[in-house]
């Protein structure tokens, strides 16, 4: 079953269960909140916003192919995955608890903060002004492909 929705301003997407949400056009919003609870997926093509908050709790996936915003906060709990390509985001906060994976390509971004607890992996590439990271558990924070311009 496919449902098509048109909205002048998208502020929140919640996928609860096994459903999927796919944004096919440009999304321009002040504040955008993305939440997956369960095994569902959110896939967005082009997002422009002031603040992005993405929360994954379960085994689903969140993918953002192009993101431009002032601040982005990602919270991943469980075995799900988040993949994002960011452009000129001033502040990025990544929190991963569990066995999930975060993959981020950061183009000309500002401060990046990573907190990993568990066996998951955070992989970062691109360029950023600063990187702060903390890790507890067997997971890895791989920033070998991230050029940090302090």
Model region roles, listed by residue range:
Residues 5-13, 24-34, 45-54, 65-74, ...:
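Short "repeat-start/strand-capping" segments in structured domains, especially the N-termini
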């Amino acid at each position: 079953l496919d449902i098509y929705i048109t909205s002048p301003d998208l502020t929140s997407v919640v996928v609860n269960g096994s459903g999927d949400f796919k944004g096919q056009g440009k999304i321009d919003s002040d504040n955008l909140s993305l939440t997956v609870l369960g095994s569902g997926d959110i896939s967005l093509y082009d997002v422009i916003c002031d603040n992005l908050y993405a929360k994954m709790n379960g085994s689903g996936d969140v993918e953002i192919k192009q993101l431009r915003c002032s601040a982005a906060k990602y919270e991943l709990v469980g075995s799900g995955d988040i993949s994002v390509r960011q452009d000129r985001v001033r502040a990025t906060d990544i929190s991963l608890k569990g066995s999930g994976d975060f993959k981020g390509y950061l183009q000309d971004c500002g401060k990046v903060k990573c907190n990993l607890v568990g066996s998951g992996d955070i992989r970062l590439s691109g360029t950023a002004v600063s990187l702060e990271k903390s890790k507890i558990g067997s997971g890895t924070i791989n920033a070998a492909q991230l050029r940090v311009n302090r």
